[in-house]
Amino acid sequence: MNTNNRHYHITTFGCQMNKADSERMAGILDNMGLISSEDPNKADIILYNTCTIRDNAEQKVYSYLGRQAKRKHKQPDLTLIVAGCVAQQEGAALLRRVPELDLIMGPQHANRLQDLLEQVFNGNQVVATEPIHIVEDITKPRRDSKITAWVNIIYGCNEHCTYCVVPSVRGVEQSRTPEAIRAEMEELGRQGYQEITLLGQNIDAYGRDLPGVTKEGRNKYTFTDLLYYVHDVPGVERIRFATSHPRYFTERLIRACAELPKVCEHFHIPFQSGDNKLLKAMARGYTHEKYRRIIDKIRELMPDASISADAIVGFPGETEAQFENTLKLVEDIGFDQLNTAAYSPRPGTPAALWENQLGEEVKSDRLQRLNHLVGVKAADRSQRYMGRIEEVLVEDMNPKNAAQVMGRTRGNRLTFFEGDIAQLKGKLVKVKITEVRPFSLTGEVKEFVLV
């Protein structure tokens, strides 16, 4: 297979797991001798790593595919690939909609990209969506950053939330071994990466599928145990993780995060609704009271911790009173950031078949009201930063102001300040905050952090 001077382009939709998968696939393509291109129209291989969590993301994929399919009629050597969750959900049915596709591959097959492409280059139209056991990552990803990195620790999800397609498209939970995770982190530390985010669809379920139990009767390998195991990896100064499920977010985990200095004081814990009846209909497995207790314990042990979450409005049957319970939870907790969405029926999920669907006008109104409250509460939360000294890991130049650099605090707050990116990139800097906004900060350099 001659890959000389052939270019590839990857467009990624959706979550951090997809972004991590795209980095792994880019690494495979690099190893094959292909060259990355920012412009899809100059690429010989186009890969769309897709998301099906909401309908608008899925429709955007089809729009992009339509344009490239037309191009393929003029350029038959163009290779079109759909990877990720839309590929897994639709499978071979995608060929009826876009017959120009060369390769359809589910997320479990990301590490097989080279083998699958070789089949394509041998003249085959390939569909790879069958469930497989995910082997340990052996391909060096082409990471988008040289400072922060994602490390997958668990794939798939065993939950059955009634609105969510993730279990059907990403498969059952498969945890990587602690040894493999630490080995990858050690290599990243040697390469100079200072911040690592551990990733999983349901990260605090890590280890449930690994063999062994302790004398106390719990799983031998838990996410809490993993944090202790990897915490002393040389070179890595910050550890984050996402995404957590309230059902499995234990006090033991909270105490570990408070005890381990490299673990950042930022927790992303989706609540989805503030109403217990809706949470039961969603099959989330917890109450709003339990969720509040988790946040209370975090703030008891780490008073300055940042809390972010996800919420859905307009779930089938949601009454105005139930929506107001969500508003009350947001008002009471005061999130630093909240990812909000109007409910979007997804094929193959129980909730999509229910008759009590809400109209788009109602969903839009509730989403606007929730977003307004989120902005107000985030602005309130930001006030605590004014005048404080915050540790910021510098990641890049401010794209809107070349005189400024930008990075994130330990609490994940985006922060801008004047500086030379050539000198500061990858540095931990003490910054005095001089201006606050709902979701970002501005400051001035006080000192460098020696690590």
Swiss-Prot record:
Its EC number is 2.8.4.3. [4Fe-4S] cluster 2 binds at residues 157, 161, 164. [4Fe-4S] cluster 1 binds at residues 15, 51, 85. Binds 2 [4Fe-4S] clusters. One cluster is coordinated with 3 cysteines and an exchangeable S-adenosyl-L-methionine. It comes from the Bacteria. GO terms for molecular function: 4 iron, 4 sulfur cluster binding; metal ion binding; methylthiotransferase activity. One of its GO terms (cellular component) is cytoplasm. The keyword Transmembrane does not apply. Its main location: cytoplasm. InterPro entries: Elp3/MiaA/NifB-like_rSAM, Methylthiotransferase, Methylthiotransferase_CS, Methylthiotransferase_N, Methylthiotransferase_N_sf, MiaB_methiolase, rSAM, rSAM_horseshoe. Pfam families: Radical_SAM (PF04055), TRAM (PF01938), UPF0004 (PF00919). This is tRNA-2-methylthio-N(6)-dimethylallyladenosine synthase. The lineage of its organism: Bacteria, Bacillati, Cyanobacteriota, Cyanophyceae, Oscillatoriophycideae.
